[in-house]
């Protein structure tokens, strides 16, 4: 059995991950961790996820359960994830990282850790989103510089980073396909007298409202026609199942920093 730990286990995504782990053949939840000030510490992780008792108590310290898992799934916050990364690197434990909002410097720390342990890091673990990334690469190469490119995304009111990591990843894929540097061509929102649009730019627009799980659309607009590639998530379970699939795929893999394109064989 693949022994899996979930950090942030008492949160919305954490509970969904617990359910996904318990549903996956050959996988089992053997550790669950949440923040030290959580009032739920000591509770059964299965009961937190409405699955019934599974005999895995919620811990407040990852260091206490390092011997109880093979791979850690972390969808928390950059500062928390980096601390957990240090523990896993020292202990030789694999990691699945779905946290977004990392700076360029913080992402480099993931690269360095990948020299010692196997890691799957992705802005989005949905199989559909990763298929969209493949389609975006093709669309950008075919349509080239003859289109204006705009990326819109919508998420629930609780999401703390914008644009979403998925939207930024989509922008990176498109920019790379066109030989552009996203940092130089990205435009984040528009207001006032902006002047005529520069076709080399890639625009981003963000919506935060209600309980939207995650909508992403990339628009390729030419004179006379438009192409839109859209993904809409209706449940967090799609991300959780992808993360568990990645955790199973990492079994026996050499140290390295992988992504979902590797897991799905889309590279």
Swiss-Prot record:
Substrates-to-products reaction catalysed: (S)-2,3,4,5-tetrahydrodipicolinate + NAD(+) + H2O = (2S,4S)-4-hydroxy-2,3,4,5-tetrahydrodipicolinate + NADH + H(+); (S)-2,3,4,5-tetrahydrodipicolinate + NADP(+) + H2O = (2S,4S)-4-hydroxy-2,3,4,5-tetrahydrodipicolinate + NADPH + H(+)
Q: Which SUPFAM superfamilies match?
A: Glyceraldehyde-3-phosphate dehydrogenase-like, C-terminal domain, NAD(P)-binding Rossmann-fold domains
**Where do the annotations place NADP(+) binding?**
35
Keyword tags: Amino-acid biosynthesis, Cytoplasm, Diaminopimelate biosynthesis, Lysine biosynthesis, NAD, NADP, Oxidoreductase
Q: Which domain of life is it from?
A: Bacteria
Pfam families to which the protein is assigned, alphabetical: DapB_C (PF05173), DapB_N (PF01113)
What does the entry list as the binding residues for (S)-2,3,4,5-tetrahydrodipicolinate? 156, 165-166
Query: What metabolic or biological pathway is this protein involved in?
Result: Amino-acid biosynthesis; L-lysine biosynthesis via DAP pathway; (S)-tetrahydrodipicolinate from L-aspartate: step 4/4
GO CC terms in record: cytosol
Q: What Gene3D superfamilies does the annotation carry?
A: Dihydrodipicolinate Reductase, domain 2, NAD(P)-binding Rossmann-like Domain
What is the predominant subcellular site recorded for this chain? cytoplasm
- Keyword hit for NAD: yes
Which compartment or compartments is the protein found in? Answer: Cytoplasm
Q: Tell me, which GO biological process terms does this entry list?
A: diaminopimelate biosynthetic process; lysine biosynthetic process via diaminopimelate
Q: Which residues form the active site?
A: 155 (proton donor/acceptor), 159 (proton donor)
**MF terms per GO, please?**
4-hydroxy-tetrahydrodipicolinate reductase; NAD binding; NADP binding; oxidoreductase activity, acting on CH or CH2 groups, NAD or NADP as acceptor
The entry sums up its family as follows: Belongs to the DapB family.
Q: What does this protein do?
A: Catalyzes the conversion of 4-hydroxy-tetrahydrodipicolinate (HTPA) to tetrahydrodipicolinate.
The protein's matches in PANTHER family, at most eight in alphabetical order, are given as:
4-HYDROXY-TETRAHYDRODIPICOLINATE REDUCTASE 1, CHLOROPLASTIC-RELATED (PTHR20836:SF0), DIHYDRODIPICOLINATE REDUCTASE (PTHR20836)
- Protein name per Swiss-Prot or TrEMBL: 4-hydroxy-tetrahydrodipicolinate reductase
Q: Which organism was this protein described from?
A: Pseudomonas syringae pv. tomato (strain ATCC BAA-871 / DC3000)
Its taxonomic path starts at: Bacteria, Pseudomonadati, Pseudomonadota, Gammaproteobacteria, Pseudomonadales
């Amino acid at each position: 059995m693949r022994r899996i730990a979930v950090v942030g286990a008492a949160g919305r995504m954490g509970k969904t991950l617990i359910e996904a782990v318990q549903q996956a053949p050959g996988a089992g939840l053997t550790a669950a961790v949440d923040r030290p000030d959580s009032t739920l510490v000591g509770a059964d992780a299965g009961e937190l996820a409405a699955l019934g008792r599974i005999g895995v108590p919620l811990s407040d310290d990852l260091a206490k359960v390092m011997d109880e898992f093979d791979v850690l799934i972390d969808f928390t916050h950059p500062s928390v994830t980096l601390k957990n990364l240090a523990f896993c690197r020292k202990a030789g434990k694999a990691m699945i990282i779905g946290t977004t909002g990392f700076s360029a410097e913080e992402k480099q720390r993931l690269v360095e850790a990948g020299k010692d342990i196997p890691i799957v890091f992705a802005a989005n673990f949905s199989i559909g989103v990763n298929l969209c990334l493949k389609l975006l690469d093709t669309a950008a190469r075919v349509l080239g510089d003859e289109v204006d490119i705009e990326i819109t995304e919508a998420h629930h009111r609780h999401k703390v980073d914008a644009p979403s990591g998925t939207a930024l990843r989509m922008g990176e894929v498109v920019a790379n396909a066109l030989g552009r540097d996203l940092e130089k061509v990205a435009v984040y929102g528009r207001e006032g007298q902006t002047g005529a649009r520069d076709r080399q730019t890639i625009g981003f627009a963000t919506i935060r409202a209600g309980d939207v799980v995650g909508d992403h659309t990339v628009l390729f607009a030419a004179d006379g026609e438009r192409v839109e590639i859209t993904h809409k998530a209706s449940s967090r379970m799609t991300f959780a199942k992808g993360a568990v699939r990645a955790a199973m795929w990492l079994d026996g893999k050499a140290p390295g920093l992988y992504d979902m394109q590797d897991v799905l064989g889309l590279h």
